[in-house]
Amino acid sequence: MKLQSILSCWAILVAQIWATTDGLTDLVAWDPYSLTVNGNRLFVYSGEFHYPRLPVPEMWLDVFQKMRAHGFNAVSLYFFWDYHSPINGTYDFETGAHNIQRLFDYAQEAGIYIIARAGPYCNAEFNGGGLALYLSDGSGGELRTSDATYHQAWTPWIERIGKIIADNSITNGGPVILNQIENELQETTHSASNTLVEYMEQIEEAFRAAGVDVPFTSNEKGQRSRSWSTDYEDVGGAVNVYGLDSYPGGLSCTNPSTGFSVLRNYYQWFQNTSYTQPEYLPEFEGGWFSAWGADSFYDQCTSELSPQFADVYYKNNIGQRVTLQNLYMLYGGTNWGHLAAPVVYTSYDYSAPLRETRQIRDKLSQTKLVGLFTRVSSGLLGVEMEGNGTSYTSTTSAYTWVLRNPNTTAGFYVVQQDTTSSQTDITFSLNVNTSAGAFTLPNINLQGRQSKVISTDYPLGHSTLLYVSTDIATYGTFGDTDVVVLYARSGQVVSFAFKNTTKLTFEEYGDSVNLTSSSGNRTITSYTYTQGSGTSVVKFSNGAIFYLVETETAFRFWAPPTTTDPYVTAEQQIFVLGPYLVRNVSISGSVVDLVGDNDNATTVEVFAGSPAKAVKWNGKEITVTKTDYGSLVGSIGGADSSSITIPSLTGWKVRDSLPEIQSSYDDSKWTVCNKTTTLSPVDPLSLPVLFASDYGYYTGIKIYRGRFDGTNVTGANLTAQGGLAFGWNVWLNGDLVASLPGDADETSSNAAIDFSNHTLKQTDNLLTVVIDYTGHDETSTGDGVENPRGLLGATLNGGSFTSWKIQGNAGGAAGAYELDPVRAPMNEGGLLAERQGWHLPGYKAKSSDGWTDGSPLDGLNKSGVAFYLTTFTLDLPKKYDVPLGIQFTSPSTVDPVRIQLFINGYQYGKYVPYLGPQTTFPIPPGIINNRDKNTIGLSLWAQTDAGAKLENIELISYGAYESGFDAGNGTGFDLNGAKLGYQPEWTEARAKYT
C-alpha cells in the first residue's frame, strides 16, 4: 500500500506539472493521460463523418444521433475547400448542404463535440484531396509548401472557414474542441528553414488570426516519420496534441482469414514521440475504401464488417493507453456527382460501422459496447502501463495489457489472443492484482477473434467491483441503486466480486444463469455464472443490480443520456433493452419519454430508477408493468412492411445525348482551345493546350471537337487522361474510330487511330472525342490535383488540326454555379443532357425536341450516348425511415457501357458494369422524395458499335423502421427536397448551353 500511495502522489504531481493549455483557453487542456474539457477528463470517442457525402442537412442530425446513441461523444469533420469554393473568389457556406452552421448546430443538439479538419489539404479520397479545383490549371504554385503563390491561394479559405470554426468553438459556446492543421503532412526534415515547417506555421498563424483558440492537432501518416510534436525535435510548426493515423487490419474481402494482426507498438511510439500529450489516433480503421474493379462490394466484405474487428482492435487501443480515438469512417456516405477522387467509385460506404444507407451494422453495435464502457470508466483516464505480454495468464496463447490507475488503484487487463488472427477458442486463468491482494481468475474464454477488458477495483456509485472477468458494458447509479451491465458470449463463464462486502444474498430473474457464490479461505465472496442466451438479471441484498447479457443481445442494449452535454456520468443515463435504436430520452416527473426507431414489434425494458412509473415511445404512452427489480417492461410496434409500396420504373422517354459526333452540329458557342502556354507542371504533348482545366472545365465528362482538312491524313495519335477507370471514345465524321473502355489501374491511355478504312473530306473533317472523368488526383499521385484532365495531346499523321473546341459542364465551373448553386458544379459534366438540364425536375421531354418512347432495357444498337427519363411517385408511411436505392442488372455478356444515374437532378451513381463492383446505389431522403413525385434520368454511353443495354433497373428498399426522428421541421424522414430547396428545377437559362 505504501508503494501505491507513492505512485498516487507521483501521478498527481506529474499531472499538475504536465497539465497544459494552448495559452488561449483553459476550457480544453491536456496531459499525458487525457484531454480535459470544461474541467472534466474525457475519453474522446469520435467518428469520422463527411457531410458533403450526405447532402441533406437534416440527415446530419440522424447520423449524429446514432453516433451519440452508440457511445460517441465527438465527430471528426473535414471541411473541403473545393466543395465550398467552386470558383476562385467564391465561398459558399449557406446554400443547401453547404450550410455548415447547421452542422455545428446539429452536433450540439445531439450532444457531441467536433474535431475540425479544414486542411487546406484533406485527402479523404475526395476530388483533388479537397484542394480547390481551380488550382488544377497550375495556378496554385508549389502545392502544400510555403510557396508564396500557394500561400496566397489558400489564405482566403482559412480566413473564412477559420472564422466559422472560431465562432463555433467551445470558447464561444460551440462544440469545436480541437482543430487539425493540414493532413498527414510528413516532417521529413527537422529544420526551421524547411518549407514544410514554414508551411505549418503559416497555417497555424492563419487559424489563430481567424480567431481559432482551441488546441491544434496533427495526424501522422502511419509510423513513417515523427512530425509536428513538441516532444520530438521541435524546430517549429509543432501542434499542441500530436496524432497518429493507423489502418492496421490488413484484411481481405475475398479471404477472411487474411490479416487481423493487431499492432502492439502504439504505446512505445507515443512514449518516444509525444510523451507529454495524451495518445491520440485521429484516424483509426473503421473500415477501408474499395476501388474500381474490386473483387467485391462493401456489403460483401465480411472481414471488414465483422464485429470481431471492433471488439479486438478498439480494445487493443485501450490496452495501450489511447484516450482519444477517431474511427475513420464512422459513416462513409456517397460520392455523388464528382466528389470522388479516382481511387474510389460512387459508394463511399467504407465498410463503416454505420452503413451508407444509415443502417446499423453489427460492427457498430459492438463498437457501441466499447463506447459505453469508456464513457463511464473514468479510471481509464489516468492509467500507467504496468506491463504487457503472455506471462499474466496460464497460457502463452493469450496476450495481456495491464493498466493501473495510481490514483484509484483501478486496474484494466485487456486480454486477447497472442496471435489475434487465430480463430481457435482458448480458455485460461488470469492473474490479477487488486487492493485486496492477488487473485487468479479462472475459466476465461476467448472464442477466436475476441478480446475482453477485465477490470479490478472498478468503482461504482455505492460500491466497488473488486474484479470482474468479463466486459463491463456500462453502469448507472439510480439513487441508492447501482446497476451494472456485463456482457459475454453464450457459454462463457464469468466471475466477479465486490470489494469490502460480506457474503450477499441475491435473487435471479429471467433466464436462470445459476449464479453461485464461493468465499474460499478469504473474506471475499466470488460470484460465478455461465452466460446463457438473452438476458438475465441478478439483484443483490446490497441493492446492486446486474444485467447479465449475451453479447448479441447487448447489441440492442442502450444507455441514452439524460443530458445533452457530451460529457456523461453514470448518474446521467438510463438503460433500455429491446429496440433497434434509442435516439434520446427525457424524463418529466415519473414519465420516461423515449425517442427511437424500431424494425419489428418487440418487448422493451426500461430501467430509470424508482421514480419512473410510465414510458412513452415516440410520444405515445405504452402499457408497462414493473418488475421485481424495478424496471418497466412493455411492448412497442415496428414497421409494417405491407404498408410500403415500391413502384416499378416504367414510362421511359429517350433522346440522343451525343449529337456532337455529327458534322452538322453547331458548336459556335463552344470554348475555343487556343492556348499555347500553360501553368501546369505537366507539359502538353501538342499545341494548342487541350487541358480541360485551362479552359475552366474541371469536373465531369468532356467533349472535344477537332477539325482538319484534306484526304491525305492517314491517322491520329491522341492521349487522354481522366483518372483511374476512365474510358473514352473517338468518332471521325460520325463513325466510331476508337473505343477505350477503361482500366481500373490506368489514369491515362493513348489511341493510335488508323483512318484507312474511313472516308475523309477535302475540308472540315471532324474528330469528336468524349472523355470520362473519375476525379482529380490526391497529392499521393504525381502532381495531384494539377494532373491534367482531358486531352494531353493530339496529332495527325500527314496533316494538322485547324481548330479544337471543348465543352464541359454548362458554362464551366462559373456558369454551372450560377445555374445551380445548390447542387453546385461538382454535380454535372459536359453531356448535352447535363448542359441543358434534362436531368432536372420540371424539365419537359417534348417529342418536338426529339424525345421518343424508349427504355434503357432496349438500349442502343450502336455507339453513342442516349438519355432516358421517367418519373415515379412514392407514398411511404409517415414516420417511417425506408432506406431506398436503385439497383442495376446487366446482361450476362456485358458490352462496355458507362451509365450515370440522376435522381431529382443529383448525379447519384456511376455504373460501369464491366469494371464494377457497384450495382446498387442508395439514395437518401431529401434527394429522393418519400411522399411525392421523383424524376430519374440515365445517361447510357455505349462505347462500342455493338451498343449496350440494361437487363433491369429497379427501385429497392433496404429495410423499414418506424421512427420518432425529427430534425426540427416535424416531417421526420418525409423530407421533400423540392420544398426544402434542395431540388432546384429546370429553367430556360439552360437552353443556351448547346
Swiss-Prot record:
Its main location: secreted. Substrate binds at residues 78, 123-125, 183, 247, 350. GO terms for molecular function: beta-galactosidase activity. Residues 1-19 form the signal peptide. GO terms for cellular component: extracellular region. Glycans are attached at residues 88, 272, 388, 407, 433, 500, 514, 521, 584, 600, 674, 712, 717, 757, 861, 969. It comes from the Eukaryota. SUPFAM superfamilies: (Trans)glycosidases, Beta-galactosidase LacA, domain 3, Galactose-binding domain-like, Glycosyl hydrolase domain. Keywords: Carbohydrate metabolism, Disulfide bond, Glycoprotein, Glycosidase, Hydrolase, Polysaccharide degradation, Secreted, Signal. Gene3D superfamilies: Beta-galactosidase, domain 2, Beta-galactosidase, domain 3, Galactose-binding domain-like, Glycosidases. InterPro entries: Betagal_dom2 (IPR018954), Betagal_dom2_sf (IPR037110), BetaGal_dom3 (IPR025972), BetaGal_dom3_sf (IPR036833), BetaGal_jelly_roll_dom (IPR025300), Galactose-bd-like_sf (IPR008979), Gly_Hdrlase_35_cat (IPR031330), Glycoside_Hdrlase_35 (IPR001944). It is an enzyme of class 3 (hydrolase). Belongs to the glycosyl hydrolase 35 family. This is Probable beta-galactosidase C. It comes from Aspergillus niger (strain ATCC MYA-4892 / CBS 513.88 / FGSC A1513). The lineage of its organism: Eukaryota, Fungi, Dikarya, Ascomycota, Pezizomycotina. The gene is lacC.
